[in-house]
């Protein structure tokens, strides 16, 4: 009811904005007056020079006094403009301070709401579950990496073994051919070499079985987590 009769009450921000607008307007008017006085000053100086050349010293003294008053007025306008600019700067500082206060008020309110919504036991449970799953993921990655390394290492060893066996058999084959010419009984070296190869392959199979068993055990442990 009171607002409808006397009008809506202005906020401090609105009052500061209106006062700053009035100050800025006054500063512009003072600046125009000062520029006008400076133009008048230049005209007086020219008139004084012209009158002095004509020898009219009485008129020169009168215009000189007018020039002094004009310069004093220009100086006053400079001071007044500086003072108004200082007040305008203070108003702007107040507006900035008020805006910062409102922002801090909003931030504080939001932080309070967030803190009230936080459930510390639930957060602790989430973090514990995250740590458990992260640890499990690291173990899975480690097991998979070891499995890949073992598989690649087995392939490399198998390839190297095959190359070595081929080289040995070639050498044995050459010896066998030479011994077949000289002594037929030397051919018995081939089965022995083959038996060694078979034994090596059996040993490799047993080692591979051990690796597979170890990998399976680690995977079983992960499933229990």
Curated annotation (Swiss-Prot):
Q: How does it assemble?
A: Component of the endosomal sorting required for transport complex III (ESCRT-III), composed at least of VPS2, VPS20, VPS24 and VPS32. Interacts with SKD1.
Instruction: State a GO cellular component annotated for this protein.
Output: ESCRT III complex
Which UniProt keyword terms apply here? Answer: Coiled coil, Endosome, Protein transport, Transport
Q: Which domain of life is it from?
A: Eukaryota
Coiled-coil region(s): 13-54
Q: Which family does it belong to?
A: Belongs to the SNF7 family.
Principal place where this protein is found?
other
Q: Its Gene Ontology biological processes?
A: intralumenal vesicle formation; protein transport; vacuolar transport
The entry's function note states: Component of the ESCRT-III complex, which is required for multivesicular bodies (MVBs) formation and sorting of endosomal cargo proteins into MVBs. The ESCRT-III complex is probably involved in the concentration of MVB cargo.
Which InterPro entries does its entry note? Snf7_fam
* Compartment list: Endosome
**By what name is this protein known?**
Vacuolar protein sorting-associated protein 2 homolog 1
Outcome reported for the amino acid change (mutating residue 186 to S) = In strain: cv. Ct-1
Q: Which organism is it from?
A: Arabidopsis thaliana (Mouse-ear cress)
Effect upon mutating residue 198 to I: In strain: cv. Dul
């Amino acid at each position: 009811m009171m607002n409808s009769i006397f009008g809506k009450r202005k906020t401090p921000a609105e009052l500061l904005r209106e006062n700053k607008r009035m100050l800025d307007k006054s500063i512009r008017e003072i600046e125009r007056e000062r520029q006008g006085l400076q133009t008048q000053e230049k005209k007086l100086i020219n008139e004084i020079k012209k009158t002095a050349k004509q020898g009219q010293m009485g008129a020169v003294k009168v215009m000189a006094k007018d020039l002094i008053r004009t310069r004093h007025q220009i100086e006053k306008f400079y001071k007044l403009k500086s003072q108004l600019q200082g007040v305008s700067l203070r108003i702007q500082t107040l507006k900035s301070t008020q805006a910062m206060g409102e922002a801090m008020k909003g931030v504080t309110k939001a932080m309070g709401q967030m803190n009230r919504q936080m459930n510390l036991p639930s957060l602790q449970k989430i973090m514990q579950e995250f740590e458990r799953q992260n640890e499990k993921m690291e173990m899975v990655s480690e097991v998979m990496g070891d499995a890949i390394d073992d598989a690649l290492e087995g392939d490399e060893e198998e390839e190297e073994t095959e190359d070595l066996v081929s080289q040995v058999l070639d050498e044995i084959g050459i010896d066998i051919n030479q011994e077949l010419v000289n002594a037929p009984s030397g051919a018995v070296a081939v089965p022995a070499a083959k038996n060694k190869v078979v034994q090596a392959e059996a040993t490799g199979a047993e080692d591979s079985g051990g690796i597979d068993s170890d990998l399976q055990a680690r995977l079983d442990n992960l499933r229990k987590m």
